[in-house]
Amino acid sequence: MEWKYMRIQGREDSWVTKYPKGIFGMCWRMIMDGKMEPEDEKLFREVVDWFIANLPQPEPCRNGEKVITFFKTGTAGEMLPMIEPAVRLMDKYNHPYDIVYTNFIGTVIYEDEWQAAVRVENGKMI
């Protein structure tokens, strides 16, 4: 079976989207709550820096719109090893998450070679 999209998400909802937080949001929350050790925060910031340098940031995300993003599985090969340290931090701090593979993500409002963004309303993709 082939999947078009993949998302790493938590089991707690974002206060903005009312949809499960993505991996970046979960890590930032742990940092803001003082739950992450300084060397782990440094590691996470290196992950973020790599993504900023290598992927476009979707305009709807920059604008704070109610959207969630998915990696495209067909081009995620280079990104997955780069996101892995953040996933290991979830494991280290015993923070629950799910890796979701799907072909159905709702109406795409932003798309590039590596990712797609969809609008979320009342905790549901539209």
Segments predicted by a language model, with ranges:
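Acidic, proline/glycine-rich low-complexity IDRs
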Residues: 88-126
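Long, contiguous N-terminal structural blocks used for assembly/anchoring
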Residues: 1-76
